[in-house]
Amino acid sequence: MRFDGESDYRHGSPEILGVLVTNLGTPDAPTPKALRRYLKEFLWDPRVVEIPRAAWWLILNGIILNVRPRRSAKLYEQVWTEEGSPLLVIGRRQAEGVATRLSERLPGPVKVELAMRYGQPSIESGLMRLREAGARRILVLPLYPQYSGSTGGSTFDQVSRVLRRWRWVPGLRFVSDYHSDAGYLDALAESVRAYWDQHGRGSKLLMSFHGVPKRYLLAGDPYHCQCHATGRQLAERLGLKEGEWVVTFQSRFGKAEWLKPYTDMTVKALGEEKLGRLDVVCPGFSADCLETIEEIAGENREIFQHAGGGEFHYIPALNDNPDHLDALADLVLRNVQGWPEANPGYDATARQSAAEASRARALGMGAKD
């Protein structure tokens, strides 16, 4: 293996703290071609689909990639904006908001980059930009509040895959999850209360999380438990009683059993009960995307009302809500403690002088630059 070095490195170069904020990803455009490229990368990840590779290759390339891209492109067309994919647009705002807050609160220099596990901007490009900026310490923050091997685990895999090719590996920290983080839960609760203050309140709050195959739970994945922990703590903050809220799981794919109860079936059952109003929030989605805008606010609304239900209210994801950005910045600050840039005594002038002295010594010993 050839390792990727830094041929343009200069002794005494200033060092900074890097933060890589990541999310799942998005196609480059709402077209079958772009969707095929995106889905191939996504669905070929062994963390996402744990099926023997040879059999899955035949299914993926022989069936799914010949059918699903056209169907998915039509769905993406419905949520695409003039700025682009909602997930990417919101992700940029989130990264900018976190960067602003960290610059105000960290004693030392920091740079925040956004990256996607699948598609662009890639994790590799994000890490490269941080390295080029002088980041010798990097915190990776996947915006998945609840950990699953298929999301956070896959992100760690890709970060490792990139860094294993670097000659000079940076200091690295990784936020596995934040499902019980007080700032995150408080931001969620406040967003629900704010929505209720403006639009009134239904008799039941449905908390829909992205689903995963049940066999992942049985194999030891903590995702199911963490979703329920988030749901319970959110309900407590909202003062909800038993029967006034329910946790469900959406977006199942294929014929295998996934985590239950299923969102669409629960929504249909509540509609058949002639529920007058249903409120839905998706605590596991840090930003609105296809799964919340089209699947929940669109498809599940139709299911509920077609079954006989009344009003259907989707409460938006936290997105770039200031409380959310504050919570994410706090999360970063706690996880970078002990690094120089987080030291209250950080002295930029002293560090620059030390760097210049180090450079002078290196040049004196024969270094070329």
UniProtKB/Swiss-Prot annotation:
GO MF terms held by the record: ferrochelatase activity; metal ion binding
Protein family according to the UniProt entry: Belongs to the ferrochelatase family.
Superkingdom of this protein's organism: Bacteria
Entry keyword Cell membrane: no
Listed name of the protein: Ferrochelatase
Keywords: Cytoplasm, Heme biosynthesis, Iron, Lyase, Metal-binding, Porphyrin biosynthesis
PANTHER family xrefs: FERROCHELATASE (PTHR11108), FERROCHELATASE, MITOCHONDRIAL (PTHR11108:SF1)
Any Pfam family matching the protein: Ferrochelatase
GO cellular component assignments: cytoplasm
Top-level class of the enzyme under EC nomenclature: lyase
GO biological process: heme biosynthetic process
Main location: cytoplasm
Functional summary from the UniProt entry: Catalyzes the ferrous insertion into protoporphyrin IX.
Catalytic activity: heme b + 2 H(+) = protoporphyrin IX + Fe(2+)
Gene3D superfamilies cross-referenced by the UniProt entry: 3.40.50.1400
Organism: Thioalkalivibrio sulfidiphilus (strain HL-EbGR7)
Protein EC: 4.98.1.1
